[in-house]
Amino acid sequence: RESGCSFVLALMQKHRRRERRFGRDMETIGFAVYEVPRELVGQPALHLKRDFFLANASRARSEQFINLREVSTRFRLPPGEYVVVPSTFEPNKEGDFVLRFFSEKRAGTQELDDQIQANLPDEQVLSAEEIDENFKALFRQLAGEDLEISVRELQTILNRITSKHKDLRTKGFSMESCRSMVNLMDRDGNGKLGLVEFNILWNRIRNYLAIFRKFDLDKSGSMSAYEMRMAIESAGFKLNKKLYELIITRYSEPDLAVDFDNFVCCLVRLETMFRFFKTLDTDLDGVVTFDLFKWLQLTMFA
């Protein structure tokens, strides 16, 4: 009698008939099975990094990578915890799939996902007196006589800046996206950005530009879903799969790429909301309670 546990893995591509109407053929797919290290067994939110896969060989894999709708293989492995990694043969290909698992004996399965968290450095908030004189001069030039940046002025400033960076794909910052940024950064509630508020936003955008360029791996001037995930993690955020899907749905263009203006709006909102939540979570239990007025004030204003 064979020793070990017998099971069948099947990986199926979804929506291929719909994709074929747009000229997209079947992707070349397959999967690999890795044993979970003893010290990580039982962890509910296991996340294996790139170094793990470089240092550990797979215990089993599909017989081949092939451009069929479904790939399936029967395996027999010793009892233990394993991670199944489905993939396309070529890296960074987008696609929906179903992974099915059939076993002779009862076995538990779960989808691995990240816990939501943000590792953000303390934001340096300078007083007006501490801000660099060159920046003050720039601010006075941009803000005009009232020394406040309005929504329209912010739109003009950002679009003037991005137009000088020919490597960035953008349709320009819309009035709505600029209004959202002003509302998120406006601490005194007057609907405009003063010197200190604009200084914070300016520093954030400079940081986001560096992250965008670093993770625009194909130099397309935009972010694919794969690049977007790495960029968001580099900015200090850990999100789960559902939130990543919502971000791509909310901020991507019809080709599922995220332009620079949408990338900035996304990260400004993420960082502001995480910092806002942290301020309200005084007992650090990860739960904040709002009354209806506070909830409407927060959601409608942002």
UniProtKB/Swiss-Prot annotation:
Q: In which tissues is it expressed?
A: Ubiquitous.
Q: Specify where the region named Linker lies, as residue ranges.
A: 115-130
Q: Which UniProt keywords apply?
A: Autocatalytic cleavage, Calcium, Cell membrane, Cytoplasm, Hydrolase, Membrane, Metal-binding, Protease, Repeat, Thiol protease
Instruction: Please indicate if the UniProt record lists Cytoplasm as a keyword.
Output: yes
The text of the family note is: Belongs to the peptidase C2 family.
Record GO biological process: proteolysis; regulation of catalytic activity; self proteolysis
One Pfam family this chain carries? Calpain_III
The beginning of the lineage is: Eukaryota, Metazoa, Chordata, Craniata, Vertebrata
Query: What is the cofactor note?
Result: Binds 4 Ca(2+) ions.
Species of the source: Oryctolagus cuniculus
This chain's function reads:
Calcium-regulated non-lysosomal thiol-protease which catalyzes limited proteolysis of substrates involved in cytoskeletal remodeling and signal transduction. Proteolytically cleaves CTBP1. Cleaves and activates caspase-7 (CASP7).
The record's listing under PROSITE patterns reads: EF_HAND_1 (PS00018), EF_HAND_2 (PS50222)
Instruction: Show the segment(s) annotated as Domain IV.
Output: 131-301
Anything known on activity regulation?
A: Activated by micromolar concentrations of calcium and inhibited by calpastatin.
Residues binding Ca(2+) 1 are 186, 188, 190, 192, 197
- The residues that hold Ca(2+) 2 are 216, 218, 220, 222, 227
What residues does the EF-hand domain cover? 173-206, 203-238, 268-302
Instruction: Extract the InterPro entries matched here.
Output: C2_III, Calpain_cysteine_protease, Calpain_domain_III, Calpain_III, Calpain_III_sf, EF-hand-dom_pair, EF_Hand_1_Ca_BS, EF_hand_dom
How would you classify this enzyme at the top EC level?
hydrolase
Q: Return the protein name.
A: Calpain-1 catalytic subunit
GO MF terms here are:
calcium ion binding; calcium-dependent cysteine-type endopeptidase activity; peptidase activity
What the entry lists under PANTHER family is as follows:
CALPAIN, CALPAIN-1 CATALYTIC SUBUNIT
Q: Which domain of life is it from?
A: Eukaryota
Instruction: Report the PTM annotation.
Output: The N-terminus is blocked. Undergoes calcium-induced successive autoproteolytic cleavages that generate a membrane-bound 78 kDa active form and an intracellular 75 kDa active form. Calpastatin reduces with high efficiency the transition from 78 kDa to 75 kDa calpain forms.
Its UniProt entry gives the catalysed reaction(s) as:
Broad endopeptidase specificity
Q: Which cofactor does it need?
A: Ca(2+)
